[in-house]
């Protein structure tokens, strides 16, 4: 008792010694925001006020003083120039133009912005006496002021929208520390507007709730706090700012959110929930190192400190006492954030769990009782009193005794194979043991009948009995087996004993000849149950029939005993020989649909899984349950019938061709004409709303057996065939292909130029030739850096050849997938990364800024096409080409729809359509507009962010129709920002007129582009694909031919990479469909449609086709 009193007094003395160390720490002046935004125009007058920055005080006597950084910064923190244009009033925080920013200065800054458009610049504002370090700018002592840069003059006041007259582009948010003196933290007025538009009156007010600690002064329009804030009472204030604009007789009101967040300081002392400061810790069966024996909880109304501050702020000390206790136990600290309700709102708080943990294994003989004290100190606590608590753990370490039942009685079959498990022995409470090492042994009373073995299971400290010698089982005299079971604790050598009686049952039957050593080899039930294998208790393998539901844990397989194999765990007996249960124990390869086990074996499989242990392979394949439907005679009869039908078909075809050539009119074909023929059976059809077949316009238009086209020469674009050398095929479809080529003296250039040449195949129809001709006519008029460029054509004295720009890196989809292989390791380290990036800029690792730049370039090209009244119809990553310098080029406007991937397109009579990229109105109503291209652009954004991923993963295209109609949209991918995903969802609005136009999309991407510069984790969550466009030919093996397919000697380099076909859309699309179509909802639409609208109606799945597809899938 005296010792306890003395210990308590010592603890109180220690607490008193800690109190003087707990004092208040002044944090100094701080900004109410970490970023400010304003617009900046070229040729704004010197002296124009721009905005105020505000500082809040830590103490009433502090006086703020503001300083500007020396430089202006641009995209990716590029240092552009010394700040010669903007100044600040040191006492008020007013930023103003010191001199006008003219066009020459703007161009100088643009040149230094690494080739990116000069959209935003920023500078740094510092608070004195904070040290003015140009390279560092961290809140609260530094803030950034961003200026949206416009290379135009300030717009006319009458043209400004009310939102532009009232608030900046970016919504402000504020940070205010608790327990600080009240002060001004914002000024509503937009100073440039007030300075340049004095005739417009703007008034502001806050929609304040009753009793809120904020006010807006009506004369100065400054927002300030009324009194010191308390975060523990309320952490967030979601206010609303109201602006009223008076311009003549016009009055308009604009409202925006005005959020204020109260920042925490350590002003709440830790406490015990419900006053509990003592916990009991009983150590008995769980005696392993790292075992948690007791936990006490401490509550703190302050928020969880940052990980770097955690050790410094919260210290936990196991107070000196018994040396054995100091060596045996330790205290672990686990903080977790929680929420508590205060004044009708939720605020964050912290619960700290202090766990008493074993620092080492304890022997079963250890027997002690003690009390441990832990001192918890919130060292940053700034309130009255002390942030110190004392935790108490009452510890009892109990001894463990070993006991076995007096007798075990088991049975075993004479047919049992080696390693067959027949039962378990276990000391009392062994399944609860942890950290106790018990070993089991068997002592046989008869040497000639020693059949069994025992091994200790590490999982539950039991002993598993198994057949170790099958020869003894066959001896008639071994009808009963007698053993002594001995369990020994390895640390203390304490023992327990029991009698084991095993009855041998049945008679021995010899093994079938030709049976495998392992049951797992068998793939069918019949052969499985006819044989035995290692580990079989009955001498015969057992078949486990699966449930047949895809990849499942209950897969079909052959096992020695379904009680133990497979069970997802390779036990200590199964580890003796891989042939016992490879389904649980195999470390080799597994082929087919499966989920691997941890750390080995098969966790789940598809169909039937069988294994070949010697080859270290398992196979999971669909179950083969069907017998042959046709025997040898049946197959002979069918083959004869097929051969006879084929002969008859050949004879009839020859007769028809002879008649056709005999009676058909054959007009002469000159070298300037191209003639194509389409069989009558290939005419497309569409379906009415009732499901009846009807001929399409395209089919009626092509009922003429032969169409002839005269291609007129255009001297401006005609290129001599003799100067064009064709090379390797880059891509081909059913009717067209693209080859790499070299052109001599192209457009007046000296020497050879690498180009791509697009042409038709011999089986092309008049429709494909019309598409190629209209593409030719459109490309003559199109000229944009982000649209594939036309160089010329060969239209005379041979087939039509289009010569277009060559893209070095192929399709964007392939480029993105290749970038996955770069990974973080490609970035190198230190200076080597920067050197590599400078020497090979196109090979450096992708950043999020690069991906946004790709999307911005494509949006620029699509904006241009929209202004040209062109609709793409197939905007996707596979149809974007990547040229030198990572320049995006829009291509493939429709001709190459026959060559796409199976999972991207749905096959119809007219080819394949890109279901997963099509807008909802295109799928259901066959409407194709610029706004349907916006939908496709949203899917393209998803492809870019996922580095070439397949949209709607796991969803077949045929099932996508109803999912889209019911509002299904793809989820936000990893590495995708909220603002990028928000842009995707806007592109996928169901109503086309609610989607953004490409001009607005470009602006949104410009804003994102200047914010992001972080590297992507290309190794995370991305599959490793093989090279997509590799056909095995080297550069030297690429054949060269001229336009007449005559071989040429190789005199030029032939480096190439495969691409999809290039193409453009029809420039003469009518505004309305030539065939009136009725929407399902009965409304008429004003969107322009694709000219062959009735043809594309045939792309939709009919109800019967959809039902057939579902049946096939199932």
From Swiss-Prot:
Q: What is the effect of changing residue 609 to W?
A: In HSCR1; familial form
Q: Where is this region: Cadherin-like region 4 (CLD4)?
A: 405-506
Judged by the first EC level, this protein's enzyme class is transferase
Impact noted for substituting residue 634 to W: In MEN2A, pheochromocytoma and MTC; familial form
Upon changing residue 1064 to T, the result is: In HSCR1; familial form
Glycosylation positions in this chain:
98, 151, 199, 336, 343, 361, 367, 377, 394, 448, 468, 554, 688
What does altering residue 634 to F do? In MEN2A and pheochromocytoma
Mutation: residue 618 to F; reported impact is: In MEN2A and MTC; familial form
- Post-translational modification summary for this protein: Autophosphorylated on C-terminal tyrosine residues upon ligand stimulation. Proteolytically cleaved by caspase-3. The soluble RET kinase fragment is able to induce cell death. The extracellular cell-membrane anchored RET cadherin fragment accelerates cell adhesion in sympathetic neurons.
Effect of substituting residue 768 to D: In MTC; familial and sporadic forms
What does the UniProt record report as the effect of altering residue 913 to A in this chain? Enhanced protein autophosphorylation due to enhanced substrate presentation in trans
Cytoplasmic side stretches: 658-1114
Impact noted for substituting residue 620 to W: In MEN2A and HSCR1
- Effect recorded for residue 1067 to S: In a patient with renal agenesis; uncertain significance; prevents phosphorylation in response to GDNF
Positions bound to Ca(2+) 4: 267, 564-565, 567, 569, 574, 584
Question: Its family?
Answer: Belongs to the protein kinase superfamily. Tyr protein kinase family.
The disorder this protein is implicated in is: Hirschsprung disease 1: A disorder of neural crest development characterized by absence of enteric ganglia along a variable length of the intestine. It is the most common cause of congenital intestinal obstruction. Early symptoms range from complete acute neonatal obstruction, characterized by vomiting, abdominal distention and failure to pass stool, to chronic constipation in the older child. Medullary thyroid carcinoma: Rare tumor derived from the C cells of the thyroid. Three hereditary forms are known, that are transmitted in an autosomal dominant fashion: (a) multiple neoplasia type 2A (MEN2A), (b) multiple neoplasia type IIB (MEN2B) and (c) familial MTC (FMTC), which occurs in 25-30% of MTC cases and where MTC is the only clinical manifestation.
Q: What is this protein called?
A: Proto-oncogene tyrosine-protein kinase receptor Ret
Task: State the organism named in the record.
Answer: Homo sapiens
Species lineage:
Eukaryota, Metazoa, Chordata, Craniata, Vertebrata
């Amino acid at each position: 008792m005296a010792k306890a009193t003395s210990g308590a007094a010592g603890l109180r003395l220690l607490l008193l010694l800690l109190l003087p160390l707990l004092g208040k720490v002044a944090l100094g002046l701080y900004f109410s925001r970490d970023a400010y935004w304003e617009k900046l125009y070229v040729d704004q007058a010197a002296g124009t006020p721009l905005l105020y920055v505000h500082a809040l005080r830590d103490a009433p006597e502090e006086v703020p003083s503001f300083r500007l950084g020396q430089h202006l910064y641009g995209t990716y923190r590029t240092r552009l120039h010394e700040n010669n244009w903007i100044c600040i009033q040191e006492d008020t925080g007013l930023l103003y133009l010191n001199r006008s920013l003219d066009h020459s200065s703007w161009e100088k800054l643009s040149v230094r912005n690494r080739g990116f458009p000069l959209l935003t610049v920023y500078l740094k504002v510092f608070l004195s006496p904070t040290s003015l370090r140009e390279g560092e700018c961290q809140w609260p002592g530094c803030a950034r002021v961003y200026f949206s840069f416009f290379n135009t003059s300030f717009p006319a006041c009458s043209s400004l929208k009310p939102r532009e007259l009232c608030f900046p582009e970016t919504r402000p948010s504020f940070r205010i520390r608790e327990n600080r003196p009240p002060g001004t933290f914002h000024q509503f007025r937009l100073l440039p507007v007030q300075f340049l538009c004095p005739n417009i009156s703007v008034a502001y007010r806050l929609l304040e709730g009753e009793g809120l600690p904020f006010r807006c002064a009506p004369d100065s329009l400054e927002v300030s706090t009324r009194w010191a804030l308390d975060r523990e009472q309320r952490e967030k204030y979601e206010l609303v700012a109201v602006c009223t604009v008076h311009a003549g007789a016009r009055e308009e009101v604009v409202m925006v959110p005005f959020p204020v967040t109260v920042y925490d300081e350590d002003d709440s002392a830790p406490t015990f929930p419900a006053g509990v400061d003592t916990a009991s810790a009983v150590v008995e069966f769980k005696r392993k190192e790292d075992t948690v024996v007791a936990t006490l909880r401490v509550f703190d109304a302050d928020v969880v400190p940052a990980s770097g501050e955690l050790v410094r702020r919260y210290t936990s000390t196991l107070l000196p006492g018994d040396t054995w206790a100091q060596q045996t136990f330790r205290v672990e600290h686990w903080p977790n954030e929680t929420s508590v309700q205060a004044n009708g709102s939720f605020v964050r708080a912290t619960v700290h769990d202090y766990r008493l943990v074993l620092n080492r294994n304890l022997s079963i003989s250890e027997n002690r009782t003690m009390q441990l004290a832990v001192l918890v100190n919130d060292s940053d606590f700034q309130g009255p009193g002390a942030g110190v608590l004392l935790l108490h753990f009452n510890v009892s370490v109990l001894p463990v005794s070993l006991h076995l039942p007096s007798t075990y009685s088991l049975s075993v079959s004479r047919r049992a194979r080696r390693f067959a498990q027949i039962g378990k022995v276990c000391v009392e409470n062994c399944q609860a043991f942890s950290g106790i090492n018990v070993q089991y042994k068997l002592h046989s009373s008869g040497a000639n009948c020693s059949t069994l073995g025992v091994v200790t299971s590490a999982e539950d400290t039991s002993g598993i009995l198994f057949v170790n010698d099958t020869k003894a089982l066959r001896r008639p005299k071994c009808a009963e087996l007698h053993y002594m079971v001995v369990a020994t604790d390895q640390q203390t050598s304490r023992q327990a004993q029991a009698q084991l009686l095993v009855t041998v049952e049945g008679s021995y039957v010899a093994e079938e000849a030709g049976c495998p050593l392992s049951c797992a080899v068998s793939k069918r039930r019949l052969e499985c149950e006819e044989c035995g294998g290692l580990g079989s208790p009955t001498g015969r393998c057992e078949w486990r029939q699966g449930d047949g539901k895809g990849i499942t844990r209950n897969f079909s397989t052959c096992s020695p005993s379904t009680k133990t194999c497979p069970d997802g765990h390779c036990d200590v007996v199964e580890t003796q020989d891989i042939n016992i249960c490879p389904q649980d124990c195999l470390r080799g390869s597994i082929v087919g649909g499966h989920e691997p086990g941890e750390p080995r074996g098969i966790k789940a499989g598809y169909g039937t899984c069988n294994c070949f242990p010697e080859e270290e392979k398992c196979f999971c394949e669909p179950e083969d349950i069907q017998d042959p439907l046709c025997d040898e005679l049946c197959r002979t009869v069918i083959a004869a019938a097929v051969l006879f039908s084929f002969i008859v078909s050949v004879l009839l075809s020859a007769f028809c061709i002879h008649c056709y050539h005999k009676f058909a009119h054959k007009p002469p074909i000159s070298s300037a004409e191209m003639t194509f023929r389409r069989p009558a059976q290939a005419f497309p059809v569409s379906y009415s709303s009732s499901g009846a077949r009807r001929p399409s316009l395209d089919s009626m238009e092509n009922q003429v057996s032969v169409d002839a086209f005269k291609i007129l020469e255009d001297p401006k674009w005609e290129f001599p065939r003799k100067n064009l050398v064709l090379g390797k095929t880059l891509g081909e479809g059913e009717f067209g292909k693209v080859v790499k080529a070299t052109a001599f003296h192209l457009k007046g250039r000296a020497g050879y130029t690498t180009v791509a040449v697009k042409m038709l195949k011999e089986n092309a129809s008049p429709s494909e030739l019309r598409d190629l001709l209209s593409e030719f006519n459109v490309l003559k008029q199109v000229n944009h850096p982000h649209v594939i460029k036309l160089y010329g054509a060969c239209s005379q004295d041979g087939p039509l050849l289009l010569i277009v720009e060559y893209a070095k890196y192929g399709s964007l989809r392939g480029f993105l997938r290749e970038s996955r292989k770069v990974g973080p390791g490609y970035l190198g380290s230190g200076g080597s990364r920067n050197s590599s990036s400078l020497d090979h800029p196109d090979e450096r690792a992708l950043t999020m800024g690069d991906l946004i730049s790709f999307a911005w370039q494509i949006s620029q090209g699509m904006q241009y096409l929209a202004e040209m009244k062109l609709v793409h119809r197939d905007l996707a990553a596979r149809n974007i080409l990547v040229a030198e310098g990572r320049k995006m080029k829009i291509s493939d406007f429709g001709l190459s729809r026959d060559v796409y991937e199976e999972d991207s397109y749905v096959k119809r009579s007219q080819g394949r359509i890109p279901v997963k990229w099509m807008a909802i109105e295109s799928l259901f109503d066959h409407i194709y507009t610029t706004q349907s291209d916006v939908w496709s652009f949203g899917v393209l954004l998803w492809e870019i962010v996922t580095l070439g991923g397949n949209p709607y993963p796991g969803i077949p295209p045929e099932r996508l129709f109803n999912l889209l109609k019911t509002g299904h949209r793809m989820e936000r991918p990893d590495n995708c920002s909220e603002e990028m995903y928000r842009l995707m969802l806007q592109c996928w609005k169901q109503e086309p007129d609610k989607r953004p136009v490409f001009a607005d999309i470009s602006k949104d991407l410009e804003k994102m582009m200047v914010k992001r510069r972080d590297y992507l984790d290309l190794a995370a969550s991305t599959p490793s694909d093989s090279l997509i466009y590799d056909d095995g030919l080297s550069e030297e093996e690429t054949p060269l031919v001229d336009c007449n397919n005559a071989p040429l000697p190789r005199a030029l380099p032939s480096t190439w990479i495969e691409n999809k076909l290039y193409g453009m859309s029809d420039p003469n699309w009518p505004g309305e469909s030539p065939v009136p179509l009725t929407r399902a909802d009965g409304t008429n639409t004003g969107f322009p449609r694709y000219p062959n609208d009735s043809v594309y109606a045939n792309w939709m799945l009919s109800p019967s086709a959809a039902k057939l597809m579902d049946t096939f899938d199932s």
